[in-house]
Each structure stands twice: as structure tokens, then as C-alpha cells.
């Protein structure tokens, strides 16, 4: 496996949070100079590939994979899609976690699920079921997420206390490996 493919995989899994140069150096065990060469190579790969919808950006000293700007109108239309579309299993999982654990950060959601949740979380925000609810007072000040009044309406309840008590739900332990 090449450093380029490892770099791409790490940035994909990091999602909207991205990864700093220091984190990438540590994870890939490369020198900063060698890593910068790989970042430049990946950036060039995306620029030249007209079939790819992604590009590599550096924002606030953090590297992220994002969609190309020319796709913004399509993605805005997607984000405005009516809620009557069925929510994916991932979106339902994230919505459940936010409902029961709010306020909660995306990283905390990821830790519970064991996979990156940024896509599902973005979809829930776009649908108006979840909203940013401040910043957590820790290093990096990540966004906190909570459900909205629309979530309550959508679920047909008036208060979060009306949600089913999760301790009464039998959970089937299942171990899975993502990688």
C-alpha cells in the first residue's frame, strides 16, 4: 500500500474535521518534507482527474478532502431534498445517538459508532433534525449537536423525555471491524 493511498484513506475517514500536518506525520511515520510531497501529489491527482468530485484543501493548517466547488449547486439541491426521503441506517444511528446523548460532538458520535459520521450528521443538519448547539470547552472547541424542535414534531413528541427509555431496549452485542 502506498503512502498516497494511506494518506487519502486517512483524510477520507477524518471527514470534515481533517487532519493536521503533525497528525499525518505521526500516523504515516513520514518526515514533514516527505509528507508535504505526498500532499502535493494527492492535490495534483485530484486537480488533474476531471472524473473525481473531490479535491484536497488546507484550511486553518488542517488538510481535508472536500467536494469540488463546481458541484456546489448539485449538493445544495441534495441538501434541500425533502425529509420524506428515507433516512439511511447511518443517519438513523446518528440521529438516535444525538437524541439520547445530546449535546454531543461528532467525534463522540464517531467513537460510539466506530466509524466516521460526518456525512450522516451533515444530512441530518440539512434536513433540520439536528442543529449545532454551541462549542465544547475542550482543545479545538468542536461543535456540539442537539436535536431540533422539528425533530420533536417529526417524531410526534413534545419533549425528549417522551423518547423510549433506552435501558428497556435489549441490545444484541455485535463486533464488527471496519478496517
Curated annotation (Swiss-Prot):
Protein name, as recorded: Segregation and condensation protein B
BP terms from Gene Ontology: cell division; chromosome separation; DNA replication
Keywords from the named record: Cell cycle, Cell division, Chromosome partition, Cytoplasm
Family under the similarity heading: Belongs to the ScpB family.
Lineage: Bacteria, Bacillati, Bacillota, Bacilli, Lactobacillales
InterPro entries to which the protein is assigned, alphabetical: ScpB_csome_segregation, WH-like_DNA-bd_sf, WH_DNA-bd_sf
Record-linked Pfam families: SMC_ScpB
Location within or outside the cell: Cytoplasm
Protein role: Participates in chromosomal partition during cell division. May act via the formation of a condensin-like complex containing Smc and ScpA that pull DNA away from mid-cell into both cell halves.
Subunit record text: Homodimer. Homodimerization may be required to stabilize the binding of ScpA to the Smc head domains. Component of a cohesin-like complex composed of ScpA, ScpB and the Smc homodimer, in which ScpA and ScpB bind to the head domain of Smc. The presence of the three proteins is required for the association of the complex with DNA.
